[in-house]
Swiss-Prot record:
Membrane topology summary: Multi-pass membrane protein
Keywords for this protein: Cell cycle, Cell division, Cell inner membrane, Cell membrane, Cell shape, Cell wall biogenesis/degradation, Glycosyltransferase, Membrane, Peptidoglycan synthesis, Transferase, Transmembrane, Transmembrane helix
Pathway: Cell wall biogenesis; peptidoglycan biosynthesis
Protein name according to UniProt: Probable peptidoglycan glycosyltransferase FtsW
GO biological process: cell wall organization; FtsZ-dependent cytokinesis; peptidoglycan biosynthetic process; regulation of cell shape
Annotated organism of origin: Marinomonas mediterranea (strain ATCC 700492 / JCM 21426 / NBRC 103028 / MMB-1)
Pfam families, sorted: FTSW_RODA_SPOVE (PF01098)
Location in the cell: Cell inner membrane
InterPro entries: FtsW, FtsW/RodA
């Protein structure tokens, strides 16, 4: 069967794109702008030492942003019903990527983890693709098998079985942080899709026990747990990264040292422009700056949840579940990243979405957010169409009444 571009894309006009939720767009733009600023500031020292220029990573991040927006506009032209049709294919494709990343010569190893596939322009992190594709697949599954999920244990367990297959490959990389985010998002979607509460509680308990067992199965994870409990017990070795992050918070106090004035980014805090960029942000902009950034995330996520809710109420369940899934993915990563940065959670290799340096995370996250924008546009078009039909129906009724009176 020949597939043409018009079978995949349904371009939107400028008038349609102007209908996207303004608060969602403005909060996203603000977060992206702060992300570029913080990557530029936090990466100065490491950029100088590695590339002999202070703004190498900022330049790369701007390139990733351009690629992400371009990819996002492409996703914006795809009707959500097409994504629903391709859910199984996308899930299988992401599974193939997780397998490929483990193949020597294809997968790229960084800091002891084999998580990336070199695409020349940037390194593709397979787990980022897998998380988004699983949201698309599970959203479609909840529509196709709605009754089974609500009434049948097998219907509830099937997506969890597929997720466990993903987790096996993720843990082989290893990528424990992505595993936690993925299983948490899938469980949350099943609950939103109507899974019985007792099944939901049982699977949450099981997931917690499994993750706890996995956390204790590797010596480096046990060390991270011990450092999380008391980083000051060994502040110059295993507890070094967290203790330096906490020092950054102490320096920042309420109002911060000022943009660009961080001390911890000067080779004291490892991964200052990636996993621990939030610590540098608070050091420079203070606790109030941290609250502002988290408030922007809260605003953006609340609008995504609202868009998803409108889709569900408008009899568009796939689009609604997908929005909820994307929002939960981002929310989980924000909570874990900030929790790690502040010492409330054990150290994991998770970036702060849209803020931390990195191509895969930024490009894939922007792609998912442009899909949310498509859902919002389709919601409004469907609502307008419904209103037109209602007006036409009332007009026809009035004509019929007039003819009856005549």
């Amino acid at each position: 069967m020949k597939i043409q571009l018009r079978d995949i894309f349904e371009p939107l006009s400028a008038n349609h794109m102007a209908k996207v939720d303004l608060w969602f767009v403005m909060s996203l733009i603000a977060i992206l702008a702060l992300g570029i600023v913080m990557v530029a500031s936090a990466s100065i020292s490491v950029s100088e030492s590695i590339h002999n220029t202070p703004y190498f990573f900022m330049g790369r991040q701007i390139l990733y942003l351009i690629l992400g927006v371009s990819f996002g506009f492409m996703m914006l032209q795809i009707p959500t019903q097409n994504l629903q049709k391709w859910g199984i294919l996308l899930m299988l494709l992401s599974l193939v990527l997780l397998v490929l990343v483990l193949v020597p010569g294809i997968g790229k190893t960084v800091n002891g983890s084999r998580r990336w596939i070199n695409l020349i322009v940037f390194n593709l992190q397979a787990s980022e693709v897998a998380k988004v594709c699983m949201v698309v697949y599970v959203s479609g599954y909840l529509v196709r098998r709605a009754e089974r999920v609500r009434e049948n244990l097998i219907g509830f367990a099937l997506p969890l079985f597929l997720t466990s297959l993903f987790l096996i490959f993720l843990l082989m990389e290893p990528d424990f942080g992505a595993s936690v985010v993925l299983i948490g998002t899938v469980i949350a979607l099943l609950f939103i899709g109507g899974a019985p509460v007792y099944q939901f509680i049982a699977i949450v308990i099981m997931a917690v026990l499994v993750m706890a067992g996995l956390a204790l199965s590797e010596s480096y994870r046990v060390k991270r747990l011990m450092n999380f409990v008391d980083p000051w017990a060994d502040p110059f070795n295993d507890g070094y990264q967290l203790s330096q992050a906490l020092i950054a918070y102490g320096r920042g106090e309420w109002f911060g040292l000022g943009l660009g004035n961080s001390v911890q980014k000067l080779s004291y805090l490892p991964e200052a422009h990636t996993d621990f960029v939030f610590s540098i942000w608070v050091e420079e902009m203070g606790l109030l700056g941290g609250v502002v950034l988290l408030s922007l995330f809260a605003l953006m996520l609340s609008r995504i949840f609202k868009i998803g809710h409108r889709a569900l109420m408008g009899a568009r369940p796939f689009a609604g579940y997908m929005c909820f899934g994307f929002a939960i993915l981002i929310l989980a990563q924000v909570i874990i990243n900030v929790g790690v940065n502040t010492g409330f959670l054990p150290t994991k290799g998770l970036t702060l979405p849209l803020i931390s340096y990195g191509g895969s995370s930024l490009i894939i996250t922007l792609g998912s957010l442009f899909v949310v924008a498509r859902v919002d546009i389709e919601n409004k078009l469907a609502s307008k169409g419904g209103e037109s039909e209602e007006r036409k129906r009332k007009s026809d009724e009035s004509i019929d009444d007039g003819e009856a009176l005549a």
